[in-house]
Amino acid sequence: MSGRIHPTAEISPDAVIGKDTSIWHWAQVREGARIGERCNIGKDAYIDAAVVVGDDCKIQNFATLYRGLTIGNRVFVGPHACFTNDLYPRAVSPDWKVIPTKVEDGASIGANATVLCGLTIRRFAMVAAGAVVTKNVPAHALVAGVPAKVVGWVCECGRPLDAKMQCAHDGKTFPELRVKRKARSRSRNRATNFH
């Protein structure tokens, strides 16, 4: 695949675009942004100044990636997903401070999800469509809802894991996730114990 930049895309001369990356209609990439190799940036996507996007990423139409965001390799960002960067937003604010956010390798952010700033979404985690992420997301976790909560676990291929933390699709198992699952269940049981 060879990359292409659509003539309507607005790319800052100070942005770095990796080899074989495609940028589609009316996308905007600001100064100091770095986009890796073999990425696909969808129509009307907005990539703010100094945002870092790794290799082999797919940023869908109308996704909004604000300053302070670092995205690893092979990350999927769905259409209309939004990453914020200010804890106390105001139209005019002399003390505006960018709060960094990180998405690790292989994670997926669903359509129309909102990720608040200052968080880390760990490797191969999956954020469901429409979720509002207000806390860090563990590796391989499937989070959904408003606010987003862990509702399951996923394989590197994105498919759900069973109770034994095994993927029915490719047979991979993740025994390290069993420990996390048990710890989460114990803390949840303590929180609901009213005795």
Give the predicted meaning of each segment.
Residues 157-158, 169-171:
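Short Cys/His-rich metal-coordination motifs, predominantly Zn2+-binding knuckles/fingers
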Residues 143, 161-166:
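Assembly/interface hotspot detector across virion components, adhesins/toxins, and nucleic-acid enzymes
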Residues 193-195:
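Short, low-complexity, charge-dense intrinsically disordered segments
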Residues 3-144, 149-150:
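Structural signal for interior beta-strand "rungs" in well-ordered beta-sheet cores
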Residues 162-164, 174-177:
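Short, non-ligating residues that shape and space the ligands of small metal-coordination modules
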Residues 150-153, 165:
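Cys/His-enriched microdomains
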